[in-house]
Swiss-Prot record:
Name of the protein in question: ATP-dependent Clp protease ATP-binding subunit ClpX
Organism classification: Bacteria, Bacillati, Cyanobacteriota, Cyanophyceae, Synechococcales
Keyword Lipid biosynthesis: no
GO molecular function: ATP binding; ATP hydrolysis activity; ATP-dependent protein folding chaperone; protein dimerization activity; unfolded protein binding; zinc ion binding
Domain ClpX-type ZB per the UniProt entry, residue ranges: 1-51
Length: 455
């Protein structure tokens, strides 16, 4: 049994155990309750000082560059690219999706005009005139389309064309504040980085949030468990989409009370959200295929049957806001994205065009690769059609095209660099058919094994 030591003292103030209310022991040291209270007061004062420094705009501005010679925003109406010019640039890289390209072209054009209008109004010195001026509010955009339909490609192509900062973020990594994952403010940090940490320039930018359907709440009905990566993220994004002063940690990660934050006004930032929304077609089909309970006349039954005939691939053209609510987006979130564009599912003909027509078409890319080995590569029209047919079967959109061509070209790119006498090479339909043809052999157990036919 340990003996009681009456001479124990606080290692910081030196008071004995009899002079204090509580003495806490550590590995070879002791601290009293009075010293603990003093430490808490010091930490509280430091916290208040840091908060005062964070909320002081001049101190924040000193840490940020104000001039960016590499980028400029055209704020004169005559220098703003017209919607036809923007769509023409998109046509060079993206095949089809005419409706989505028109919506994006008009939205970007109006974004430029809002920036020009704001600069014009800010330059006026007459306060009475400013108070009566019309305020132009932004219209955020929601892109809905199946995987591989070109949502991300449209955003990346816009980024090449625009003179404003453009950032792409992934919604799948976001969580509600206080949980493991990224805060929504990290989206703004990406825009800041694209602007070389220029706050004024970042406040005129455009942000594309990909995989936005992944933050849909897990159930249409309220749950007692907290949905930190679904509805919680939607709630956190509301003010940012609408327009607010957001505090962004310059180093990324979670906001810390002892770290300075950069303040960004999101009222002039255009947000474009995109997602595949798998299962949304079924919700639309179910709504359109509803029929009444009880007795119905023949004419009523014919009306119901007519609605049921709608092709599931075209059902998203009849999309309503209630369908998005049933999918898992809260009404407040939908209300802050008033413009909705539905991308078409890619057909076989569209996939053929994607292989050959765009500026960076896959066929052109592989021709360039083999030209570096002094080999001229060509594709027969039938082979392009066969590749498109195989991609259509995989149901992953344009992404399947690269996978198929990589598999098709593997042996060719492996042997051709060593064949000095080969100067031309042609991809035929037979080569494509031999690569992907298969037959099913039944095993005694009843299972199936797929064996590729030899060429």
């Amino acid at each position: 049994m340990a003996k009681f030591d009456a001479h124990l003292k606080c290692s910081f103030c030196g008071k004995s155990q009899d002079q204090v209310r509580k003495l806490i022991a550590g590995p070879g040291v002791y601290i009293c309750d009075e010293c603990i209270d003093l430490c808490n007061e010091i930490l509280d004062e430091e916290l208040l000082d840091n908060q005062a420094n964070t909320n002081n705009p001049p101190q924040v501005k000193k840490k940020l560059p104000t001039d960016n010679p590499k980028k400029s925003v055209p704020l004169e109406l005559t220098s703003i690219p017209k919607p036809l010019e923007i769509k023409s640039f998109l046509d060079n890289q993206v095949v089809g999706q005419e409706s989505a390209k028109k919506i994006l072209s008009v939205a970007v054009y109006n974004h430029y005009k809002r920036l020009a209008w704001k600069v014009k109004e800010d330059s006026k010195n007459n306060n009475a005139t400013d108070s009566q001026a019309t305020k132009l509010q932004k219209s955020n955009i929601l892109l809905i389309g199946p995987t591989g339909s070109g949502k991300t490609l449209l955003a990346q192509t816009l980024a090449e064309f625009l003179d404003v900062p453009f950032a792409v973020a992934d919604a799948t990594t976001l969580t509600e504040a206080g949980y493991v994952g990224e805060d929504v403010e990290n989206i703004l940090l990406r825009l800041l980085q694209k602007s070389e940490m220029n706050v004024e320039l970042a406040q005129k930018g455009i942000i594309y949030i990909d995989e936005i359907d992944k933050i849909a709440r897990k159930s249409e009905n309220p749950s007692i468990t907290r949905d930190v990566s679904g509805e919680g993220v939607q709630q956190a994004l509301l003010k940012m989409l609408e327009g607010t002063i957001a505090n962004v940690p310059p180093q990324g990660g979670r906001k810390h009370p002892y770290h300075d934050c950069i303040q960004i006004d999101t009222s002039q930032i255009l947000f474009i959200c995109g997602g595949a929304f798998i299962g949304l077609e079924d919700i639309v089909q179910k709504r359109m295929g509803k029929h009444s309970i009880g007795f119905t006349t023949n004419s009523d039954q014919n009306k119901v049957d007519t609605k049921k005939i709608v092709d599931p691939r075209d059902s998203l053209k009849n999309l309503e806001l209630d369908d998005l609510v049933k999918y898992g987006l809260i009404p407040e979130f939908i209300g802050r994205i008033p413009v909705c564009a539905v991308l078409d599912r890619l057909t076989k003909e569209t996939l053929e065009s994607i292989l050959t027509q765009p500026r960076d078409a896959l066929v052109k890319q592989f021709k360039t690769l083999l030209s570096m080995d002094n080999v001229e590569l060509s594709f027969e029209p039938d082979s392009v059609e066969a590749i498109a047919n195989e991609a259509y079967k995989r149901k992953t959109g344009a992404r399947a095209l690269r996978s198929i061509i990589e598999e098709l070209m593997l042996d060719i790119m492996y042997t051709l660099p060593s064949e000095e006498n080969v100067k031309e090479f042609t991809i035929t339909k037979k080569m494509v058919d031999n690569l992907f043809s298969s037959k099913i052999v039944k095993l005694p157990s009843g299972s199936k094994r797929i064996i590729k036919e030899s060429a």
